[in-house]
Amino acid sequence: MTADPSPGPRSPRGGRSPRPDGPVSILICPACGTKNRIRPSPRGVPACANCKATLPWLVHATDATFDVEAAAQVSVVVDLWATWCAPCRFVAPILEDLAREHAGRLKVIKVDVDANPALAQRFQAFSIPTLVVMRDGGVVDRIVGALPRPQLAARLAPHLPPH
């Protein structure tokens, strides 16, 4: 991931204040444990600021940020979920694990359907969890319901770029 040459404004305490160009996701490096702030970006793959290891790419998106997040150059899994959904809670750690396992090849975008109804409608998420697999901006697969890890990994495997 390339560094942003614009450092942004300073806060009164001397640190950087939040930038107006989008929310920040915090990704924890599995290699060294460093917390990394990642902004929505259609280019590149996030790398740890400390050890430069490829980071697992799991972010939360909204109606406003989704298109930038989904424009990634890797396979994207859109997880349409809700806080009250028990099967969604079953799938969440599996997706986190797959994002770690396929760091640099897979981006998981979590969308809370209650907070982002336009995206739920756009992807026709009539049942949740609904997973939408995207490649190069287009939908290549849809998975409705909770699958165990082996079956979910098998469904995603053909859509992942080669190592």
Task: Describe these PLM feature segments.
Residues 29-32, 48-51:
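Short cysteine-rich clusters marking metal-coordination/redox-active sites
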Residues 26-27, 45, 82:
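Residues immediately within or flanking Cys/His clusters that coordinate Zn2+
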Residues 73-74, 81-84, 127:
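Short pre-active-site segment immediately N-terminal to redox-active cysteine/selenocysteine motifs
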Residues 61, 80, 92-118, 125-128:
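Thiol-based oxidoreductase modules, predominantly thioredoxin-like and allied folds used
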Residues 37-46:
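Short linker/helix segments within small regulatory modules
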Residues 36, 54-55, 92:
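Cys/His-rich microdomains that often coordinate metals
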Residues 127-163:
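Non-catalytic, surface beta->alpha helical segment in thiol-disulfide oxidoreductase systems
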Residues 59-76:
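A short beta-strand-turn-helix
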